């Protein structure tokens, strides 16, 4: 057994995900996409709105052919990237397409040509909340889930 704390990450958007991670032995969790869509997040409002509007099937992984996979929301840029990957485009052609694409999304709010990095849980996010609200709601939900399972773990 591992004697260091395990932090679960990926696919966690709410208290049920937190509770599941704890029930599997994690000592803590990390949520990425959930906080990208928070009120305090510095990403452009257009980016946040795309996450909030996303459905559970709206993310895609690009970069598998380069060894640098990135999950992001589907848009024109990801469609073009996947097309080029399917055609076995070389690394430099793929790099050229994505050069500056994260900045386009985060700073400029370009939801067509920017990389809208987001996990599969984007479809679970329905509104913009403060970080405090996200944490309090997540912990409360986790406590309820764990209590319903008859486990007593302090969160």
Set out the residue ranges of the language-model regions.
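Conserved active-site-proximal phosphate/metal-binding subdomains
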Residues: 1-7, 13-155
């Amino acid at each position: 057994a591992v004697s260091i704390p395990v932090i679960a990450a990926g696919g966690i958007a709410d208290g049920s995900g937190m509770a599941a991670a704890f029930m599997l032995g994690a000592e803590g969790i990390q949520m990425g996409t959930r906080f990208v869509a928070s009120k305090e997040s510095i990403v452009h409002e257009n980016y946040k709105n795309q996450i909030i509007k996303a459905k559970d099937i709206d993310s895609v992984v690009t970069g598998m052919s380069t060894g640098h996979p990135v999950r992001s929301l589907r848009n024109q840029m990801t469609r073009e990237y996947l097309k080029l990957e399917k055609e076995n485009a070389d690394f430099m052609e793929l790099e050229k397409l994505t050069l500056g694409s994260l900045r386009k999304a985060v700073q400029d709010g370009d939801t067509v040509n920017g990389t809208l990095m987001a996990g599969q849980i984007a479809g679970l996010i329905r509104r913009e909340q403060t970080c405090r609200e996200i944490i309090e709601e997540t912990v409360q939900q986790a406590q309820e889930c764990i209590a319903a399972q008859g486990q007593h773990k302090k969160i």
